[in-house]
């Protein structure tokens, strides 16, 4: 066990870290082996082993090294980190990322590595675990300079937060954010800590290194307290941003539909330009996007909102799409840009579960006795199914799934069952309507957005359409009272599509 020395020069570091950890008992340290994270590892170890002495609540701690594969020394650094954790009795693991596979997709390798690193780290967090990084005050100064370079507003200039929540799911703490690099160096030398020097830290092609090596030393020499002043400025910007969120909260809640994340844009016309831009920005952040630029907000307004009434505008935002339908804006995964080609698939009823293509979920059929279950409504919705997609923090993957049910007549012995995606010809007669309509007209009447229409499974018995599952049922699919059984068809799908089914259920009830 490493002994504890509570000399006055170290007490400030212990106090700041202890204060940041209040209420958290399962910690995961992002440990690179560099000076900063080595200092934090050492402090956390001492607090863990001497919680009574430092009035710190007991906590569990483990460390993760992210192997980027950028440096030729990455394997050696991983071994070093393993040994440092071993002598402290801290569980340790390594995760690998490959920056070069995606380098052509994003020219900024620095940002790419950071994004991949956080994604992998978040995916490794277990229930109630929080992530710790060793960012300090000097890192905050660099972040502010980079924000200035990008022309950021108060949100960007607020820098890094000591306590942040990502995607409403992952907690990130930065216990050393109020500490200077000099404090950490002094601690490391006095404790005789061993750390690695990353050779890429001297490469001034990277923006942070350029600032750290070429720009900031002269500034610190001229104004020794510059980092403290910048930290205060960042906090003031953060306070202003929090206040703005508070003031806009009521307006924002009136505009957004939480069931599918869509935004009513008609009311935006009555607001001032700054308020309109602020609301659009908060809407995009609602999807865990990076801070949208001024130019991007303007493009959404001009190219999507203000496009012709009969147009179907699409604006790609990295891996997302911004689309307009009727009086709403939608954010969608980029893979929903195009409609699916017509697909026809046979369903062998020996298997009651049918896996749909294109990650559209699964269908499940269940024969029921008509005497035991006569539904009041041909549709039924059950939310909060205990099934989630995965642990990614992407907004379209973090949503729970929704189970949509519909009840139709059972197939006859000579009827083959198939699932079709895409458009079909001819007039359709659906429950709730007396006159026939083409499928396109039905989609329009039920308010189904164009990008979802080709993704809704159509259930056929032979050549006869029975139901667009969860949306409408045809007269040919109506339950026949003289039959002994009916079919319950369930579609397990992403909740992002829930709104169209809620609308169709309301339509049938009316």
From Swiss-Prot:
Going by the record, the broad EC class of this enzyme is: ligase
Enzyme Commission number(s): 6.3.4.19
Q: Where found in the cell?
A: Cytoplasm
Q: Which Pfam families match?
A: ATP_bind_3, TilS, TilS_C
- Extract the InterPro entries matched here: Lysidine-tRNA-synth_C, Rossmann-like_a/b/a_fold, TilS/TtcA_N, tRNA_Ile_lys_synt, tRNA_Ile_lys_synt_N, tRNA_Ile_lys_synt_subst-bd
Question: What residue stretch is flagged as signal peptide?
Answer: none
Name the domain of life. Bacteria
Q: Where does ATP bind?
A: 32-37
Entry GO CC: cytoplasm
Q: Which GO terms describe its molecular function?
A: ATP binding; tRNA(Ile)-lysidine synthase activity
Q: Write the record's keywords in alphabetical order, separated by commas.
A: ATP-binding, Cytoplasm, Ligase, Nucleotide-binding, tRNA processing
Q: Which reaction does it catalyse?
A: cytidine(34) in tRNA(Ile2) + L-lysine + ATP = lysidine(34) in tRNA(Ile2) + AMP + diphosphate + H(+)
| Keyword check for Transferase | no
GO annotation, biological process: tRNA modification
Q: Does the keyword Ligase apply?
A: yes
The family this protein is said to belong to? Belongs to the tRNA(Ile)-lysidine synthase family.
Q: Which PANTHER family match?
A: TRNA(ILE)-LYSIDINE SYNTHASE-RELATED
Fill in the domain comment: The N-terminal region contains the highly conserved SGGXDS motif, predicted to be a P-loop motif involved in ATP binding.
The UniProt function text for this chain reads:
Ligates lysine onto the cytidine present at position 34 of the AUA codon-specific tRNA(Ile) that contains the anticodon CAU, in an ATP-dependent manner. Cytidine is converted to lysidine, thus changing the amino acid specificity of the tRNA from methionine to isoleucine.
Q: What is this protein called?
A: tRNA(Ile)-lysidine synthase
Which source organism does the UniProt entry give?
Answer: Blochmanniella pennsylvanica (strain BPEN)
